[in-house]
Amino acid sequence: MIVDNSKDFDLKSFLANLTTHSGVYRMLDKHGEIIYVGKAKNLKNRVNSYFSKGAKDSKTLMMVEQIARIEITITPSDYEAYLLENNLIKQHRPKYNILFKDDKSYPYLVISRDKFPRVSFYRGKSAYKKGQCFGPYVSISSVKNTLNTIQKIFPIRQCENSYYKSRVRPCLQYQIKRCLAPCVGLVSQQQYDEQLAILKKFLAGKFSTVLEEISAKMYQASEDMEYEKAQVYRDQLVVLRKLQQQQIVDIQEDKTFDVIGIYMQDSYASIALLQIQNGDVVADRHWSIDAKGQDKTSIMHAFLSHFYLGDEIRNIWPKNIILSKVEFADITDLMNSISQKIGQAINWIIAPAADNLKWLKLAEVNARQKLNIYTSSKSQYQKRLESLKEFLELEKDIKRIECFDISHFQGEATIASCVVYTDEGEDRKSHRRYNIKDIKAGDDYAAIYQAVSRRVSSGLEADNLPDVMIIDGGKGQIHQAEAVFREFGIQDKVQLVSLGKGVERISGKEKIYKGFDDTEYTLDEHNPGFLLLRQVRDSAHDHAIKGQRKKVSANRQSSIIEEIEGVGPKRRKALIMYFGGWQELSRASVDEIAKVKGISKKLAQEIWECFH
């Protein structure tokens, strides 16, 4: 139950009547924002401790001064309390909690839940919603290489469901023996599931088991005189043997473990997680945080809860977890909750012997190195922010910067990009692109006006306007943004600035204009504020170019067919649904093209001539 959600909050009465049950508590400020989330075995004792006379660190004292209301949720057990606490922290990201931000969103291989499943990859932890996950992989290139390897060995489909459902004949993948063509019923459910089961064992690292099973199936097929089937198994074995020579080994679960090292310096902390399989580091991940007022114990405790009680996906969980030496007041409760969450017992090693000590030292060295990089980069970035604030003569610190850039191809396929930087650095998840419509070809001014209008309109509605908005361009571009600002009345809410290369178009000699100020400014090319302006501008430019290229590519795909009189949208769709793509259409004969509904022999001849 949630307790006390009223504006007239009586702290003294609330503390006196608190329950002694386990649960989660939330501290809210006068604006109703959650500033801290905590978990307790005894809510009464834990919440009252914040208001007792005992010694407290400066961060806790600062937080207590801001508490305007407290809410609690009673849970049936400690386990549910841990899970709820973790979910609330991720949802609200309270400023006084220890917050972890993964250094990247890792890709996973996913086997879908379809009747004839497909294998594909997804980035991020939402992958588990798509099907059975394997990973995470350390990079996009590694997961793509694995997909390519899978396709050579296991004829499991990788196509999108929309493509799969539209097939009326096998695609090229079937012809080169990389798919069993379940789309047109050329394989039974049993045969497909058999290949799928072997693939899952392969992805789980059961390499020897896979070799044994395929060998047995090959010999059985040969004895049954099913020679084509035996040849398929033989071809699989050939590729697998080559992989074996490249040192792919079995994953032995008793030799699979995680190592977690922590390093602290000043008010910062870094955690390194090494994932070990058969004596090899298969993945290393890092988290660096601001940890003012925290100690190693509280940081490690928060990390274990964040990582192991969160939505991390692992097809093999470690049986051993090695930790930096820290003291836990309720380590047993946390360990039990983690074991319950992942469904197996874990051996926690806090003081490792010589065999495992080397791994812990390696993790701690990694944590230290990452923290040095993090603090150095953060310090440099803060200097740039402060320098830009000084140049723009702003009273408040800069918390959010947005930059707009326009890209088009010969006046067509116009894209506006908007990149976001916060006081923590680049915020890639907030980047976005705008498709620009209903303007004259190549009209950058109109494109800027449209993009900024759409952003300001949504920003006012969501109350998330930036502190600084940068426009890539000169006087003409910034005047368009100024017109939008006047229209919405936000001249005093957002600092507008533009960065253009000027007549000379020399990098480092850019001309700067402030909003509603026609003065032309220049800064030394080594000025920290100028470097930040260029950094953000270049990021926006790259983001725009990538979006524009995608749009041009999409527009070109059907341009060849569009030139043929008599082939409209319906017939183009029919052609794609029948052949599965332009490439396969280009290989088709006139007679094959004429089989498509609505395509006459004469029209089929014209289409064929387009590609030949």
From Swiss-Prot:
<dbReference type="GO" id="GO:0009432">
    <property type="term" value="P:SOS response"/>
</dbReference>
<dbReference type="InterPro" id="IPR004791">
    <property type="entry name" value="UvrC"/>
</dbReference>
<dbReference type="Pfam" id="PF08459">
    <property type="entry name" value="UvrC_RNaseH_dom"/>
</dbReference>
<dbReference type="Pfam" id="PF02151">
    <property type="entry name" value="UVR"/>
</dbReference>
<keyword id="KW-0228">DNA excision</keyword>
<dbReference type="InterPro" id="IPR001943">
    <property type="entry name" value="UVR_dom"/>
</dbReference>
<dbReference type="InterPro" id="IPR010994">
    <property type="entry name" value="RuvA_2-like"/>
</dbReference>
<feature type="domain" description="UVR">
    <location>
        <begin position="208"/>
        <end position="243"/>
    </location>
</feature>
<keyword id="KW-0963">Cytoplasm</keyword>
<dbReference type="GO" id="GO:0005737">
    <property type="term" value="C:cytoplasm"/>
</dbReference>
<dbReference type="GO" id="GO:0006289">
    <property type="term" value="P:nucleotide-excision repair"/>
</dbReference>
<comment type="function">
    <text>The UvrABC repair system catalyzes the recognition and processing of DNA lesions. UvrC both incises the 5' and 3' sides of the lesion. The N-terminal half is responsible for the 3' incision and the C-terminal half is responsible for the 5' incision.</text>
</comment>
<keyword id="KW-0267">Excision nuclease</keyword>
<feature type="domain" description="GIY-YIG">
    <location>
        <begin position="20"/>
        <end position="98"/>
    </location>
</feature>
<dbReference type="Pfam" id="PF01541">
    <property type="entry name" value="GIY-YIG"/>
</dbReference>
<dbReference type="Pfam" id="PF14520">
    <property type="entry name" value="HHH_5"/>
</dbReference>
<dbReference type="InterPro" id="IPR050066">
    <property type="entry name" value="UvrABC_protein_C"/>
</dbReference>
<dbReference type="InterPro" id="IPR047296">
    <property type="entry name" value="GIY-YIG_UvrC_Cho"/>
</dbReference>
<keyword id="KW-0227">DNA damage</keyword>
<dbReference type="InterPro" id="IPR001162">
    <property type="entry name" value="UvrC_RNase_H_dom"/>
</dbReference>
<dbReference type="GO" id="GO:0009380">
    <property type="term" value="C:excinuclease repair complex"/>
</dbReference>
<dbReference type="InterPro" id="IPR038476">
    <property type="entry name" value="UvrC_RNase_H_dom_sf"/>
</dbReference>
<keyword id="KW-0234">DNA repair</keyword>
<keyword id="KW-0742">SOS response</keyword>
<dbReference type="InterPro" id="IPR000305">
    <property type="entry name" value="GIY-YIG_endonuc"/>
</dbReference>
<dbReference type="InterPro" id="IPR035901">
    <property type="entry name" value="GIY-YIG_endonuc_sf"/>
</dbReference>
<dbReference type="GO" id="GO:0003677">
    <property type="term" value="F:DNA binding"/>
</dbReference>
<comment type="subunit">
    <text>Interacts with UvrB in an incision complex.</text>
</comment>
<dbReference type="GO" id="GO:0009381">
    <property type="term" value="F:excinuclease ABC activity"/>
</dbReference>
<comment type="similarity">
    <text>Belongs to the UvrC family.</text>
</comment>
<dbReference type="Pfam" id="PF22920">
    <property type="entry name" value="UvrC_RNaseH"/>
</dbReference>
<dbReference type="InterPro" id="IPR036876">
    <property type="entry name" value="UVR_dom_sf"/>
</dbReference>
<protein>
    <recommendedName>
        <fullName>UvrABC system protein C</fullName>
    </recommendedName>
</protein>
